[in-house]
Amino acid sequence: MKNLFIGVDFSKEKVDVAIIFADGLAETASRVFNEFKTTVSGYKQLIKWVEQNSSGIEPSLWLFCGENTGDYSKGLCNFLYGKGYDMWLENAKSIKDASGLRRLKSDRAAASMIAEYAMRNYDKAIMYEPLSESLAQLRELFLYRQMVVRHRCSFQVRRGEKRLTMEKSPIKTMISQSGRHIVSELNKEIEKIDKRIAELIKSDEELIEVYTIVTSVPGIGTQNAVCMMVYTDNFRRFNYDSRKIACYYGIAPFGKDSGTSVHSDPRVHYMANRQIKAMLTQAALAAVNFNPVIARYYMRLVERGKKKQVVLNNVKNKLIHLITAMVRNRQLFSPEYKISA
C-alpha cells in the first residue's frame, strides 16, 4: 500500500507537482504543490523537495503518476526509473474520464487531479519501464520514416494536382521540377532510414529473433513487423495478450446492450491508433493474397455470406492472435497451421 501520491503534470519547459498524503482513500494532510524545470537538475530538486515534504514516509511507499505525453514525459520517467522510484504513466483520457467534471483548468489543478487519480486507483497501477536502448532507437527511426513518407506523399499529391490543373507556364515547370527533385531526395532519405533500421535489427539478438518470427508470416513485411515491435515493446507491453493488442490496434469489436431498446451488433471502436491500424489493413490484404492459411480462412467466411469488410477485420484479428502466439512460443510460421472460423 502506498501512502504518498505525487501527481505530475508534464509540459515542455516545466513539470507541476502535487503531493497527496493518504491512508487508504482518506487524505491525512493538506496537499502541497511546486513546479520544476525539465532538466536533470530540476528532477534532482523535485526528489529533494518530495523528501523534505514526505513527513518521514519511506520512498518505497511513494507513487509518482503522470499522463503519457510522449517525449515530454520520457525524461522524468527515465530519471525516476533509474533512481528506483515507482512511476505510473497513465493514459490521459483514463485520468480525465475517472476524475469527473472539472471547471478549473490549470497546471497545478491538473497535477492535483493526477495525484488524486493515483490515490484512488493505485491498485491498478502499472509501473513504468523504459524501452531497451535498441528498441528505443528503432522506434525513433520508425517514427522518423513515417514522417518522411508523409512529406513525400504530400509533395507527390501537390505536384500531381498542379500538373493537371495549371496551364503550361514557367511557374508550372518550376513547381514540377522542384517537386520532382524533393520527392527524389526524400526517396533517398527513406532508403537510408531503411538501411539503418536493418542494421539496427541485425545488431540486437532479441530484435532479430522477434523480427524473424514476425516476418515469417506471409503478408507481414518489414514496416508492419517493426511497427508491432516498437508499439508493443516486443509484445511484452501487453504481456503477450493478443486480445489487448487487438484492442490497442482498434480491431476488437464491442457491442452495445442497454435496457430493452439499445441492442447493436459488435463494432470496432473509433478509439485506436489509426496509423498502425491502416498498416495492419495493408498486411491483411497482402496475407489474403499470399498466405494460404489466411486465404482459406478468408474464403470460408466470405462463402458464409459475411461482408468483406467484416471478414477483413477478422483477418486482422487472426493475424494479431497468430503472430502474438508465435512470438510468445518463439516459433516460426508454418503453412500447416489450422485456423478455426
Give residue ranges: language-model regions.
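Anion (oxyanion) recognition and catalysis
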Residues: 81
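Acidic, metal-coordinating catalytic cores used for nucleic-acid/nucleotide bond scission
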Residues: 62-75
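Long, charge-rich intrinsically disordered scaffolds of nucleic-acid metabolism proteins
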Residues: 88, 92-213
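Short, glycine/acidic-enriched loop or turn micro-motifs at the edges of active sites
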Residues: 12, 70, 94
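Low-complexity, acidic/Ser/Thr- and charged residue-rich accessory regions of DNA metabolism proteins
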Residues: 260-261, 298-341
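Gly/Thr-rich phosphate-binding beta-strand-loop-beta motif of the actin/hexokinase/Hsp70
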Residues: 2-22, 114
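Phosphate-backbone recognition surface of nucleic-acid-processing proteins
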Residues: 216, 222, 226-304, 308
